[in-house]
């Protein structure tokens, strides 16, 4: 049924489907009272999400490694919507030091935080270690976002408490989370080049995004905090993430042309989960084409989620 919906664009229970765009799913939503951080908001899905949230009135903070690209994105959005509120801050998610620096920069703005969209990522990279000695896909896609989210939680909690507005965290996962290592997360061999598979390492990092969402969702519910966190699969979209994918991906794309989305369609699920009023109180879910769907067995394994949480905490605490 999911494949049928992807091919035909038929709407699901939410009223939206694979053919829906980010503008479609946010139609008539007024976001002027909201502040959102979007990581990687300089191209592809992230840029489209920044544009649409800015169009709907949200104060958007583009967090990006390349400050020139971020400012170019800001100028593009302002040319389209002169009254949009867009700020840019430097953030390299592969660097723990950069994440901590970003937090100081953001808190200095003295603004609330209602929405965090963990969008940035790398894909199918040849093996390399980050400056902190962590395999690059795991470092950028999971550890950087894990630390960023944890360090922003107090601000999100106070914003939700003072405004009465539900905070929302959106983790960009992927259907690729189903293609990972045999054990799901290869805890003992994350940084082992001999066991490295660029595609399985990507799948592992996307599984980690889902496990992070589910673990944090449970913790926030236990605290009674007015913040939700959900994961999304944006669909198959040609973005610069595919720069390391090579001939095999080109062949796959040619064979499955009817499944691929354009960027406005690819950003729809992100914007739907971030803004739509129908999702008030919905947390710990996995969305595809703006509808709740079922992830892999690994993704709903609470023991694995807790193990990853503890592993991630110990890892970031061990770094300056």
From Swiss-Prot:
Keywords: Calmodulin-binding, Chloroplast, Membrane, NADP, Oxidoreductase, Plastid, Plastid inner membrane, Protein transport, Transport. One of its GO terms (molecular function) is oxidoreductase activity. Disulfide bonds: none annotated. NADP(+) binds at residues 40-46, 92-93, 119, 140. GO terms for cellular component: chloroplast inner membrane. Its EC number is 1.1.1.-. Substrate binds at residue 174. The keyword NADP applies. One of its GO terms (biological process) is protein transport. The active site is at 196 (proton acceptor). It is found in: Plastid, Chloroplast inner membrane. The keyword DNA repair does not apply. Gene3D superfamilies: NAD(P)-binding Rossmann-like Domain (3.40.50.720). Involved in protein precursor import into chloroplasts. Part of the Tic complex. This is Short-chain dehydrogenase TIC 32 B, chloroplastic.
